[in-house]
Structure formats: structure tokens, C-alpha cells
Amino acid sequence: MNFTYILIAIVVIGVAILLLTLQKRKAEQKKEEKHLEELPKAELLKPHHAEEEKAPAPARAPKVEEVKISFTERLKTGLSRSRQEVWGKLTGLFSGGLDEEKMESLEELLYGADIGTATVSELMTQVHKKAKEGNLTEDSFKQFLFDFLKAKMNPIQEKVDHSLYEFNVSDTGKTKVIMIVGVNGAGKTTTIGKLATKLRTQGASVVVGACDTFRAAAVDQLQVWCDRAGATMIRAKEGSNPSGVGYDALQAALNQKADYCILDTAGRLHTKENLMEELAKSKNVLKKLDPTAPHQILLVIDAITGQNALRQAEEFHKTLDLTGLIFTKCDGSSKAGSAVSIVEQLKLPIAYIGVGETAADLDVFKVDDYLKALLGME
């Protein structure tokens, strides 16, 4: 009995202790919660995102105005090789007067300029005369030479109405037909491309006939030029009749009322008579469509060939009755002076002169500009 009471008492005491402990813990928990509530609320920190450091915008390059170089300047640059390798050697030659030794040096220099034997002979006769007068300096010699060469070229150049060569829209409403001839390698195809480009730039309508049907590469090259210029090109299968292509090109030009019809031609060696006859046939077939065509027949001459070009020119002239010349590649030759004797001997004017690869490097030939660029005169 006593044992039962003792056991009950122990249980009651244990429960009481447990309740007290739980109550104490609950009170402490409330106290802790109250303390936490009384604490200042912490501010929420936004995550820190570093701003991307933008590199400063690159300074805008200053707008470069397109510098348009005049053809006169292009001509000076283009003829620099002839000027430096030949005429530049005049420096110092006249100091102390012209003795016989210096006269011989001057004569050799003039022959090297490729202006022609007859021209040099006549020139030296006058130089001897002026030297005796004792008033021949480097500057006065250049002026004398300028006047002398101009007198040789001007009578031929002035025979021609140079308005024919200007890059203008037709003012007559009639298609102008230009036939371009020359040996392979002289620069015919490139020259035609430049002519077409310059004419199109001035607003003229142009039809080009690719009559050199035996050189596919030349036809493709011409096609590129025409596509860029916006000119119409008439071509045929490789090996087609060249005169037939010329006829078709002129027919297309007339149908379109184009300002110009420019015809490329075969460029085999001038010694092949049958090929020269082929050119004559190409010329004559055009007259079926226009009795006055072609209005110009221009021979392209590579300046590098110098005096050797005379033989070529004579053969072409005899067959086709040329109306003028186009002097090309003057920038790559020291023989640009050969233009003087070629003009004088053939009695044919130079229509255009080329001094580089672009269309801007081809322009109407002007005697004064040419001679000043050749001799290094302002």
C-alpha cells in the first residue's frame, strides 16, 4: 500500500516538473520572439550588378573629301618616267656653256627620247645656232624645245575638230560609230572600256560591239567594263564572223537611238594581209546601215613600242584610212616622246592619251598639256 502511494507521488512530481520545464521553455521562447520583433528590420540589399564599362566610342574618322585629281596632274604623274629618265638628264648640261662634248650628250639624249631621227637632226641644227649666240640655258632650252615640238604637232592636231573627241551626248540625234583597231596587247579592250565609262558618266548611251570573236578572254573583259558602265554589249559565240557582230551592234545602236556605237576588233599582227582585209570588210559592212559609218577609226598605239609603232600604224592606215590615234600606257614607258614623230610622220592626230588603268586616266589629247608634262614645265 505504501509502495503504491510512493509510486503515484513520484509520477505526480515528475509530471509537475515536466510541466514547469515546458512552461519555462515556452516563456523563454516568447521572450526571444518579442526580442526579435523589437529588433530593427534589416534592409534588403539588392544584388550588386557591376555596370558594364562601355568603352568610349571610337572617334569618328574625319570625313575625307574625295579628292578629284585633274587629268593634267594625272598626265604629269603618268609621264614622270619619260621626264625623269630622259628630260631630267638635262640638269647641269647647260652650265658653263655647250661645248662639243655636251652637244653630243644632248643629241644622244634626244635620240633616247624617241622623238624621231629627222626631228632630232633638225632640232640639233637649231641648237648649234642658238649655242653660238651664247644665250642657251636649261630653262630657255626647255622653252625652245616646247615651241619646236609644238610647231611639229599643232598643224596636224588642229586639222581635227576636237569636239569629235569630247565625251558628250550626241547633239545631232545621230549615232556616232567609232571603230577601234590595233595589235593585240596595245590596250584596245581596256581603252574601249574606259571610253564607254567616260561617255556613260556624261549621260551618253553606248552600245559596244565585241568583234574580236577569237579571243574569249577579251570579250569577257569587255563585258565586265560594259556591265560596270551600264553600256549595252553585243557579243556572239567564239569564232563568229567579226563583221557580222559589228553589223548587229550598229543595228542595235540604231534601234536604241544610242549616242555611240563603239566596235572592238581583232588585233592580230598587221603583217597578216587576210586579217587586214577582214578589218576592211568589217568597216565596209557598216555602210549598209549608215553610209557615213564609221565616223572615226582610231588606232591604239602602245607607247612602249615607241618608233616601232610607226610600221604598224602605216599598215593600218593604208588599209583603213585612219582618222586618229589613241596613245596608251604612257605611264609605263620612257618613250612617250615618240608621239611627236608618230603624229608628224603619219599626219594623224592623237585623239586620246592614256596614263593609267582607270577610266579617269584616259582623256582627250592636248598638245600643250602633253609637252609641259613631258618636259617638266609649269
Which residues make up each language-model segment?
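P-loop/Walker A NTP-binding module and the surrounding RecA-like catalytic core of P-loop NTPases
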Residues: 118-121, 146, 150-378
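Non-catalytic terminal/linker segments enriched in charged/polar, low-complexity residues
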Residues: 1-152, 156, 161-165, 173-174, ...
